Design a protein with these regions (language model features):
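Acidic, polar-rich low-complexity tracts and alpha-helical solenoid repeat scaffolds
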Residues: 1-244
Length: 244
């Protein structure tokens, strides 16, 4: 009745009292859910009291028919506020997080990894991306993207073996093959092989890049052609090298 009258403050107080009472467990559960909704709808903080109340509900009523809705509300708050560190702490306080919440955790760790990468904190980025990959069963494309950026992070640290492994895993897993990132994975693998003096593999990877590049990165495209020429020079295929 209170909710229908839109008197959210009175409704919140009534539901809070019912949730804290010694009433029938089903009544307590319903009241706790309604209380959580009231808090969510009247909260002045984007990431505040509503998150705490939703966490409490999931821990007290993990098998509730409302658990999925509450989980979805939490995911919405986690992703929309972009308070990623606070979101991780919130998820860690939930005893039995849903698949939706664990998928959100996977994506949050990926976002934290990209932030660290942008700040040239490559070791920290590797930690975040690795944790995101561990949760890969929840969203395969996020896992693939994390593998790519793991490769980039290792590459920046000159750890070429790990970089190559992650780029190759990314190429095997991703379904988004019509992207600049897909092309760049081959470009990076070309350079890894080139530095290892594996000129045959390097040439193949640079050729893969050239075939996939759509003109979005003319600098890398010109460089790849030069490296194909260098690969031919290094194996003394001079006629082929002249073409580049």
């Amino acid at each position: 009745a209170y909710l229908q009258l839109a008197d959210k403050t009175k409704a919140r107080m009534a539901f809070e009292q019912a949730a804290a009472s010694n009433a029938d467990p089903k009544i307590k559960e319903q009241a706790a859910y309604n209380y959580a909704l009231c808090i969510h709808e009247t909260s002045y903080s984007a990431f505040g009291e509503s998150v705490t109340v939703f966490e409490k509900f999931l821990n007290e009523f993990p098998n509730s028919p409302y658990a999925e809705k509450v989980s979805n509300y939490l995911v919405e708050v986690y992703m929309n506020t972009r308070s990623y560190d606070a979101a991780l702490k919130s998820i860690d306080r939930i005893s039995h997080p849903s698949k939706a919440i664990l998928e959100a955790k996977q994506k949050i760790l990926f976002q934290l990894g990209t932030q660290s990468f942008a700040n040239t904190q490559f070791e920290q980025a590797i930690g975040c991306f690795s944790q995101s990959v561990t949760l890969g069963q929840y969203n395969l494309q996020t896992k693939a993207d994390a593998l790519y950026w793991l490769g980039e992070s290792y590459y920046r640290l000159n750890r070429m073996r790990e970089a190559a492994r992650n780029f190759n895993e990314y190429l095997s897993l991703t379904r988004q093959r019509d992207t600049e990132m897909f092309a760049l994975a081959y470009y990076n693998l070309g350079y890894i092989a080139f530095h290892q003096k594996d000129y045959s593999t390097a040439e193949n990877r640079f050729r893969n890049f050239v075939q996939l590049e759509k003109g979005e990165n003319p600098t890398a495209l010109a460089d790849a052609y030069n490296r194909i020429g260098d690969c031919n020079l290094n194996v003394r295929r001079f006629d082929e090298a002249k073409q580049y």
